[in-house]
């Protein structure tokens, strides 16, 4: 485990003193920044959990692409399994786990689509081949073989040539509006630090509760 005792001694956001912090978004942003320095790959990776039409849980890894005062933002194909599940049941849970820091964050709440302007702005920042891929991939649908995917990529590449690749209508972002955010920090002998922040809905005040490990 990478030691950060010097920093922890002076920064309540990154030490056991985080249990006294009153603003969870600020605490999360600090932890994410710390993870960016120590995680070997994708510190913004998170498990996204949804439920299917039968009520069975479904989970996969996605990347956090935005964090603001309202919530946690990711982008995807609305025709994918997760897109269809969120359309039917717009609620989700997220889990961030940073092994290098021995920390975990859990998030739960309703989900909304981002605005078209937000989706357009983010799509414009993606590498061109990723933009092409958004058109070429019928995400979560059966694929006959790799050649079929490559043919779809070639077709989309030819279609847009050297021009701007527009955002597909089925590609957008979702924002998880948290009603609960739990922070977990590993401690010796499994005497971990756990704090959960809860609120009744967006804009409501947060309550803070320390939990037994």
Swiss-Prot record:
Keywords: Flavoprotein, FMN, Oxidoreductase, Pyridoxine biosynthesis. GO terms for biological process: pyridoxine biosynthetic process. Its cofactor is FMN. It comes from the Bacteria. InterPro entries: Pyridox_Oxase, Pyridox_Oxase_CS, Pyridox_Oxase_N, Pyridoxamine_oxidase_dimer_C, Split_barrel_FMN-bd. Substrate binds at residues 65, 122, 126, 130, 190-192. Homodimer. Catalyzes the oxidation of either pyridoxine 5'-phosphate (PNP) or pyridoxamine 5'-phosphate (PMP) into pyridoxal 5'-phosphate (PLP). This is Pyridoxine/pyridoxamine 5'-phosphate oxidase. It comes from Xanthobacter autotrophicus (strain ATCC BAA-1158 / Py2).
């Amino acid at each position: 485990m990478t030691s950060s005792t010097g920093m922890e001694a002076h920064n309540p956001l990154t030490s056991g003193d985080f249990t006294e912090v009153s603003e969870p978004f600020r605490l999360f942003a600090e932890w994410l920044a710390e993870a960016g320095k120590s995680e070997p790959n994708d510190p913004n990776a998170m498990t996204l959990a949804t439920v299917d039409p039968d009520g069975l849980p479904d989970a996969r890894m996605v990347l956090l692409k935005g964090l603001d005062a309202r919530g946690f933002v990711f982008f995807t194909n609305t025709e994918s399994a997760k897109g269809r599940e969120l359309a039917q049941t717009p609620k989700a849970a997220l889990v961030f786990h940073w092994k290098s820091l021995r920390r975990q964050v859990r998030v739960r709440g309703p989900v909304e689509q981002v605005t078209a302007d937000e989706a357009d702005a983010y799509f414009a920042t993606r590498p061109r081949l990723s933009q092409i891929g958004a058109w070429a991939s019928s995400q979560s649908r059966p694929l006959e073989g790799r050649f079929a995917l490559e043919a779809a990529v070639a077709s989309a590449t030819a279609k847009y040539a050297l021009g701007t690749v527009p955002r597909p209508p089925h590609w957008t972002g979702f924002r998880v509006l948290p009603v609960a955010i739990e922070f977990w920090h590993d401690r010796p002998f499994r005497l971990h630090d756990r704090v959960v922040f809860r609120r009744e809905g967006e804009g409501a005040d947060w309550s803070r509760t320390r939990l037994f490990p």
